Each structure stands twice: as C-alpha cells, then as structure tokens.
C-alpha cells in the first residue's frame, strides 16, 4: 500500500502527502468545482476561471506568475474536468516553498484583471474553435450531453465562444468566491517531502494552523441535481467530413455501485488500450475498417457513463455498427471462460501497475479520489477486488447495459 499522511488546517483545507524517494515533488490544489457545478447560464465559467487565474494576484503580476517556477526549472499547470479544477506543479524538492507560495496565491488571491481577461478570452475561444474542428474530440462532449441531457454533467467544459466572450472580472470573482475555498479543496503532494515542513509551509501561506493530523473523516463530494429518466436516442449529424465518427453507449454505474468493478473489467476486454481488445480485433485487425476504436467508462457520485467510439469511412458505418453489435451480443449471450477471465484479470492488473509508475498521474489520481470519495489508493485491495469478479457478474452487466434498445447513438456523417 502507498504510504501517505493527512491533516486538516483550521480553515478546512485538507492535506495529503504521499512519500517517495524521488527528488521531484508533484503538488497542487484540487478544487471541488468543475463544469458540473456551473449554472446553466454560465456554462464554460469553470474552464474560463482556470485560464484567468494565472493573470495576476494581489501580490504577483501575470509575468511574475509565469516566471516564479520556470526560473528554477519547475512546471506549473492546470486543467478542468466535470467535477474539479486542478492547479499543480512539478518542482525539485528544494523549491517546494516557492511552489506552495505560488499555488496558494493564484488559487485564493487572484484578481482577474479585465485587461488580461480581454486578451485571454481570445486564447480560450481559439481553443474552443480548434476543438470544434476536431470531430473525434467534439463527439465525446456532445454524446455526454445526450446521455445527461438537461443535467450539469452534460455541460461542455469549454463552453461556447459567444458566452465566453461575455465573461468579466465580476463573473470570475463570483464563481471563485463561491467555490475556491480552502474547505472545498485538497492540497496533495507526492515526493520526498517532510510532512511537518509541508504542514508548516501550508499553514504559513494560508494564515492558519493545523487542526487535525491523521485520518480524515469525510470527503467533499458535492451533491448534484437529480437526473431525469434516461431516454435512449439516435442522432445523425452531417459534418461534411471524409470520415464518419460514431459513439454508442448508455448510462452506467456510480462510483460506489458494486457492479462498477465488473464493468471496469468488461470495458477493458471490449475496448481497452490493448491491441487484443475485442473491438480492435474485430474492426481493425481482421477487417481494416478503422484506425481508432475504443470503449470508455466514467463514474460520478450518482451515475456513470459507458461508451464506444470509432471512426471509419462513411460507407463502412453500417458494417462497423453490425460488428460492434455482434461483439456486444457475444457478451450478453455467453459468459467468459475461465481462461478468458484469468487473462483479462492479469492484463488489467498489469496495466494498473504500469500506470502507477507514472508519479504525476498517480498524484493527480490520488488527490481526486481523496477529494471526492475519501479514497486511499490501495493497489493490493484493488487487485483483490479484480480477482473477485466472476464471469456471471460480467455477463449480468452486459445484459443490463448492452441491450440494443437501451443504447444512445450519435453519428457524424
């Protein structure tokens, strides 16, 4: 199990540190505020705030923010998801005080000057248009909007250019004052970090003291509005592109649903990253119909999403759809054999082990799990859960989620 330590400051900030011998420290603030926390009239504001948070604080100019870590070889980055916004750095251990000072400053003391916003809006809109020009990326957002139609989970993270151009300093302050609070965030650090020094630095920068050291008794997941009933649909959109893009899927399981692990394994068998994934073998290796075919799943606190994506020549859409249907029917009708199940478990455990060797991704994953769900990433326990999955559980998931009449389809032609 990965060694970690936790604490809470008087202002409610949660702290988690993972120990490793690496001289590089990955650290940052993970804030419980993403696209799903936006109001319907402010879609795109979370991502907008992520951009303009770098444009100056009460004691640093935008150029100061850029130079602070770069002049010692460090890296400063950020990203927005449906459920959170993350500001983080990669820095040599000796520069940790500098990183904590900068990260705390931009997260809690940014001023969002309108002059800087006016320039950055053009950058954001260029990002949006670039995304709109990439149907293989755009289709994921539009599909999620179909699955969660009318719900904040269906919000497009980037938003629309016409709305983003109207955002002001006042809008940024309104959103961040509501969500960018110490008691709505977690600070994570992964590296060769002295925990007592880490607490001292964070207490100093936050102007507060340590309340608790040890296990944290609750997570910070915010309840989202109740989902409306799911209604599968098929939508075709003429994109005037040479290649067709197709997504097929269904609502799936929430994070704490016991069926989620069976879907996790089934999804990897069906369309995971391996070339031996069933869909890759059927559509690409045997017939050469696609370059990319994959299946994905995501779980939120109260629901989830499972989907398949492929891109092919427009004249091959029907054949590819039939092949996908045949693979789904196979899982519905036949349980995995013992040898198939054993190989599938070995494969996914190997993938997990290799992924955990990426310290940056592990730090971000650990922070997210701890922020929303109170998870402590225990690889041994995860392997035990995988080993406990049965062929019958996998078949039951397929029989629930893969039924043709329950699938939503989005096709760009």
Where do the protein language model's features map onto the residues?
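N- or domain-start disorder-to-order transition segments that initiate the globular core
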Residues: 1-25
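Charge-rich, well-structured scaffold segments of protease-associated domains
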Residues: 3, 8, 64-219, 225-226, ...
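Short, conserved beta-strand segments within well-ordered enzyme catalytic domains
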Residues: 16, 26-30, 53, 77-79, ...
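Active-site SXXK
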Residues: 44-57
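His/Glu-based metal-binding/catalytic segments typifying zinc-dependent metallopeptidases
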Residues: 19-23, 28-30, 214-276
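Short pre-active-site segment immediately N-terminal to the catalytic Zn-binding motif
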Residues: 33-42
């Amino acid at each position: 199990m990965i060694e970690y330590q936790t604490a809470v400051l008087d202002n409610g900030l949660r702290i988690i540190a993972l120990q490793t011998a690496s001289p590089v420290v990955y650290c940052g603030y993970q804030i419980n505020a993403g696209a799903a926390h936006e109001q319907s009239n402010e879609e795109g504001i979370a991502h907008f705030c992520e951009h303009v948070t770098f444009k100056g604080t009460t004691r640093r100019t935008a150029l100061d923010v850029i130079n602070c870590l770069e002049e010692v070889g460090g890296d400063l980055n950020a990203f927005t998801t449906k459920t959170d916004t993350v500001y983080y750095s990669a820095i040599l251990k000796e520069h940790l005080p500098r990183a904590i000072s900068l990260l705390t400053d931009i997260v809690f003391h940014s001023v969002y000057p309108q002059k800087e916003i006016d320039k950055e809006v053009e950058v954001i809109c260029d990002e949006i248009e670039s995304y709109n020009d990439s149907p293989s990326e755009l289709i994921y957002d539009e599909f999620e909007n179909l699955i969660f139609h009318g719900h904040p989970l269906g919000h497009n993270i980037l938003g629309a250019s016409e709305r983003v151009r109207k955002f002001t300093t006042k809008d940024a302050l309104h959103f961040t004052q509501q969500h960018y609070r110490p008691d709505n965030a977690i600070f994570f650090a992964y590296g060769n970090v002295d925990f007592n020094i880490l607490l001292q630095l964070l207490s100093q920068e936050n102007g507060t003291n340590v309340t608790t050291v040890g296990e944290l008794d609750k997570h910070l997941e915010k309840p989202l509005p109740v989902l409306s009933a799911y209604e599968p649909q098929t939508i075709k959109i003429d994109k005037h592109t040479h290649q067709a893009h197709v997504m097929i899927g269904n609502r799936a399981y929430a994070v704490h649903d016991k069926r989620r692990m069976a879907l996790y394994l089934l999804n990897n068998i069906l369309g995971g990253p391996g070339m031996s994934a069933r869909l890759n073998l059927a559509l690409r290796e045997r017939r050469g119909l696609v370059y990319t075919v994959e299946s994905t799943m995501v779980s939120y606190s109260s629901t989830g999403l499972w989907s398949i994506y492929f891109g092919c020549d427009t004249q091959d859409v029907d054949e590819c759809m039939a092949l996908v249907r045949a693979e789904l029917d196979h899982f519905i009708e036949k349980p995995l054999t013992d040898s198939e199940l054993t190989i599938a478990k070995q494969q996914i455990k190997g993938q997990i082990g290799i992924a955990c060797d990426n310290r940056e991704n592990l730090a971000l994953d650990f922070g997210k799990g701890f922020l929303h769900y109170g998870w402590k990433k225990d690889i041994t326990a995860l392997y035990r859960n995988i080993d406990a999955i049965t062929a019958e559980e996998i078949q039951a998931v397929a029989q629930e989620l893969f039924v043709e009449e329950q699938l939503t389809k989005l096709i760009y032609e």
